[in-house]
A protein has these predicted regions:
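Flexible loop linkers connecting adjacent transmembrane helices
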Residues: 2-3, 37-42, 65-90, 256-272, ...
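Extracellular loop-to-transmembrane helix junctions
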Residues: 13, 40-65, 79, 83, ...
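Juxtamembrane transmembrane-helix boundary signature
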Residues: 25, 52-86, 94-104, 296
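Hydrophobic, small-residue-rich membrane helices and short re-entrant helix-turn-helix hairpins
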Residues: 32, 36-40, 146, 205-237, ...
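Extracellular/periplasmic helix-exit of transmembrane alpha-helices
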Residues: 61-68, 73, 215, 236-266
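Loop-to-transmembrane helix boundary motifs in multi-pass membrane proteins
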Residues: 88-89, 125-128, 233, 237, ...
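Transmembrane alpha-helical segments of multi-pass small-molecule transport proteins
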Residues: 93-96, 119-140, 157-162, 324-338, ...
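Hydrophobic alpha-helical segments and their helix-loop junctions in multi-pass secondary transporters
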Residues: 156-182, 191-212, 368-377, 402-414
């Protein structure tokens, strides 16, 4: 019995030691763009899109686990491996696409910050610049361990969406049915929403950030089992939160009158009739998610570009040691925050576009990942099992199919 307890304590200690990259990456996936996408899905289509969360969770676990494993085994980031195995030209093209997609995501995060604080009558011309400065100082003046602790603390606040979901008192029977009953409508808006839901849940930036964070934290192949548990727990948690966001908006908006919503702020206001707490919790959750992701997305982009093009990177390095890394991080924050402050800028379209761009870029990132992780000279005994490969290729085919369907429907002028 003593041996069993000792082994259990050892496993817990290992888990706590590696806790961070997988859990943070999965949970921050529910950023302001994600919250808007899930809110819009629930407001317009009710409980119908819930069925997508189950397969999305499975694919999210597989993709995140692959990145965590590659980082632990090779000690290199994803863009670093792409450059070494496929050459600088392909890597450069991938980085351009990733920067474009990530920039729209950064804009979405600062739009979320502005929207959440406008609910409390704080002007975006105050909230956005102050948040941008705070985000910049957090990473530039901290180190990996201190930044990670703050990120883990921020994860706790996502429970606000679960509480909001219960306060709205939705139709739980309908929610349960459509969680397992696939519904596919031949409708441009619905398919666009599905691509957005997949794109916001399994975003390309996540794969790059997770692998880089695993490497910087120093997780080794010996600690891989604990790291895998962390990834699985984080992925399940992120889609539980997504479920409650869809359910809250289906109960608060769709049940009364299905409609499009302009932003996540409108979703929060729709919860007011169900009590002040529902409104406050949803609003607080939106601010937390937005500022959390506003830290990580520029960080992920800086990691990816610097690794891919061979520059020094890492939060543990000082500015003079990794000037390009910190320049990119600063540039994305300034440009993202500045865009939100432009008058009459179409922020809502930008937010949904960012999620769809994620969905369009995702198949290409997954193709690189599955090729890399099956290289025996790179991964040794840690190559992918067959069913991982099968699931990943099926995801690639489905995402390409959804994208082509959306293009076809748009061309034919269907609603």
């Amino acid at each position: 019995m003593r041996k069993l307890l000792s082994r259990f304590r050892y496993q817990i200690a290992i888990f706590l030691a590696v806790l961070g990259p997988g859990f943070i990456t999965a949970v921050v996936d529910n950023d302001s763009g994600g919250i808007y996408t899930y809110s819009a899905a629930g407001a317009k289509y009710g409980y119908l899109p819930l069925w997508t969360l189950l397969p999305i969770t499975v694919v999210l676990i597989i993709t995140q686990e692959m990145c965590s494993r590659m980082g632990a085994v090779t000690g290199k980031g994803l863009s670093d491996l792409i450059r070494e195995e496929f050459g600088l030209r392909i890597t450069f093209l991938m980085m351009i696409l990733l920067v474009l997609a990530n920039f729209t995501n950064v804009v979405a995060e600062f739009a979320g910050i502005a929207s959440s604080l406008e609910l409390f009558h704080i002007s975006r011309y105050i909230s956005v610049p102050l948040s941008a400065i705070g985000v910049w100082f957090l990473v530039v003046k901290g180190n990996y361990r201190s930044v990670e602790k703050i990120f883990l603390f921020a994860c706790v606040f996502y429970v606000t969406y679960i509480v909001s979901g219960f306060l709205v008192q939705p139709d739980w029977k309908e929610a349960a049915i459509y969680s397992v009953k696939p519904v596919l409508l031949l409708d441009g808006g619905y398919i666009y929403m599905l691509i957005g839901m997949v794109g916001t849940t399994i975003a390309p930036w996540m794969q790059f950030y997770l692998q880089s964070a695993v490497v910087e934290k120093g997780v080794s192949a010996k600690e891989y089992a604990a790291s895998r548990v962390e990834v699985i727990v984080g992925c399940i948690m992120t889609d539980v939160i997504a479920f409650f966001i869809v359910v809250a908006c289906a109960g608060a908006i769709y049940r009364i009158a299905p409609r499009d919503i302009t932003d996540a702020k409108e979703a929060a206001l729709a919860l007011k009739p169900f009590g002040q707490y529902a409104f406050l919790l949803f609003s607080a959750g939106l601010f937390n998610a937005s500022i959390f992701a506003a830290c990580i997305l520029p960080l992920s982009t800086a990691y990816s570009v610097c690794e891919g093009l061979g520059f020094e990177s890492g939060v543990n390095r000082r500015i003079r040691e990794a000037p390009i890394f910190y320049f990119l991080y600063t540039l994305l924050i300034v440009a993202g925050a500045g865009t939100v402050l432009l008058p009459h800028f179409p922020l809502v379209k930008m937010i949904l576009l960012s999620q769809v761009l994620n969905g369009v870029l995702l198949p290409f990132v997954l193709i690189f990942m599955v090729i890399l992780i099956n290289k025996a000279d790179l991964m040794g005994e840690w190559v992918n099992p067959r069913w991982f490969n099968f699931t990943t290729w099926v995801t690639v085919v489905i995402m390409i199919g959804l994208t082509l369907a959306l293009v076809g429907i748009s061309v034919r002028g269907m609603p």
